[in-house]
């Protein structure tokens, strides 16, 4: 893993504590960037990922890590923020991609990128890393390339850096990768996947093994030919 120096360029990395965002952090560090991680406590039912994010930030040599609270559960509308909405279990990948799932959190990535943008402006970061990928954007509107390009254009006109001719870049290095491709990349970069938690509905702190996130994670490790270090409840 490359070490950041006092002259290193800064980046903000949105870090959930899951497989994808942790790999994103490793990419930023491998590029020699001074990585400042930002995690968001948005009222998610899987809050255990925040503790994982803290450990991962330390393990991968992040220059800093902040957790910001924005209670999206006040609005509900998602299985991840409303206990009355069941998290889907045992679905095929084709079924996952058929429509926008109930695990979509309204405006979540818009809110998170806005917070990352504010943090980046304050610390003088040039880039924001987000772990969206090919698996996500088939079902989630705020994980698609069009959304990322639109947000980057917004940042150009809505920030001091942008209007002064130094616009921030939105980086999504996993965008064209499958889950297996992400696992291979992260393994090469030394991501401690045993620390990560991708589950939408953990059971006593352990991944449930049956939600969409767990299913895709399992498939990714299997297709990558890498042993999955996750201890699943089922």
Swiss-Prot record:
Q: Provide the cofactor note recorded for this chain's UniProt entry.
A: Binds 1 zinc ion per subunit.
Q: What keywords tag this UniProt record?
A: ATP-binding, Ligase, Metal-binding, Nucleotide-binding, Queuosine biosynthesis, Zinc
Tell me, what is one Gene Ontology molecular-function annotation carried by this entry?
zinc ion binding
Instruction: List required co-factors.
Output: Zn(2+)
**In which pathway is this protein known to take part?**
Purine metabolism; 7-cyano-7-deazaguanine biosynthesis
CDD domains in UniProt? QueC-like
- Binding positions for Zn(2+)? 199, 208, 211, 214
Q: Where does ATP bind?
A: 15-25
Biological process terms in GO annotation: queuosine biosynthetic process
Short name of any one Pfam family annotated for the protein: QueC
Task: Name the enzyme group at the top EC level.
Answer: ligase
Return the similarity comment.
Belongs to the QueC family.
The record's HAMAP family line, in alphabetical order, gives: QueC
Name of the protein this chain belongs to? 7-cyano-7-deazaguanine synthase
Species this protein is from: Anaeromyxobacter dehalogenans (strain 2CP-C)
Q: The organism's lineage?
A: Bacteria, Pseudomonadati, Myxococcota, Myxococcia, Myxococcales
Instruction: Please state the gene responsible for encoding this protein.
Output: queC
């Amino acid at each position: 893993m490359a070490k950041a120096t006092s002259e290193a360029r800064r980046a903000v990395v949105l870090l959930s504590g899951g497989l994808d965002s942790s790999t994103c952090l490793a990419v930023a560090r491998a590029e020699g960037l001074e990585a400042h991680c930002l995690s968001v406590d948005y009222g998610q039912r899987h809050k255990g990922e925040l503790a994982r994010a803290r450990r991962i930030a330390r393990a991968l040599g992040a220059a800093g890590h902040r957790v910001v609270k924005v209670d999206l559960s006040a609005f509900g509308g998602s299985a991840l923020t409303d206990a009355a909405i069941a998290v889907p279990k045992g679905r095929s990948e084709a079924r996952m991609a058929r429509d926008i799932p109930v695990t979509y959190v309204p405006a979540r990535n818009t809110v998170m990128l806005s917070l990352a943008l504010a943090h980046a402006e304050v610390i003088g970061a040039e880039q924001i890393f987000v772990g969206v990928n090919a698996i996500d954007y088939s079902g989630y509107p705020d994980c698609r390339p069009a959304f990322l390009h639109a947000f980057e254009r917004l940042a150009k006109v809505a920030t001091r850096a942008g209007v002064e001719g130094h616009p921030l870049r939105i980086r999504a290095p996993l965008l064209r990768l499958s889950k297996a491709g992400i696992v291979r990349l992260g393994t090469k970069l030394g991501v401690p996947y045993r620390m990560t938690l991708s589950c939408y509905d953990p059971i006593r702190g352990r991944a449930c093994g049956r939600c969409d996130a767990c299913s895709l994670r399992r498939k990714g490790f299997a297709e990558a030919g890498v042993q999955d270090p996750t201890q699943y409840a089922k």
